[in-house]
């Protein structure tokens, strides 16, 4: 569950955006491609931890 697929794209203004494919709405901006990916993965872990804390079943990703 720790190997997330992150789609990345460079915005017109030069910022990078990374979106975790298996978790809709989990996306993050970064100044570089690597930063956007790292931030998106970190956010994905936070979202999963929150779901677990609230007793929501987390399917294998």
PLM regions: where:
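Central antiparallel beta-sheet cores of small beta-barrel/beta-sandwich binding domains
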Residues: 29-33
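N-terminal segment of the canonical double-stranded RNA-binding domain
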Residues: 1-15, 19, 23, 27, ...
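Short, charged, surface-exposed hinge/linker loops at domain edges
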Residues: 1-5, 34, 38-61
């Amino acid at each position: 569950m720790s190997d997330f697929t992150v789609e990345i794209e460079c915005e017109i203004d030069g910022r990078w955006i990374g979106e975790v494919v298996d978790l809709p709405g989990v996306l993050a901006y970064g100044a570089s491609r690597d930063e956007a990916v790292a931030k998106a993965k970190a956010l994905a872990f936070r979202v999963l931890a929150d779901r677990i804390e609230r007793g929501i079943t987390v399917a294998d990703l």
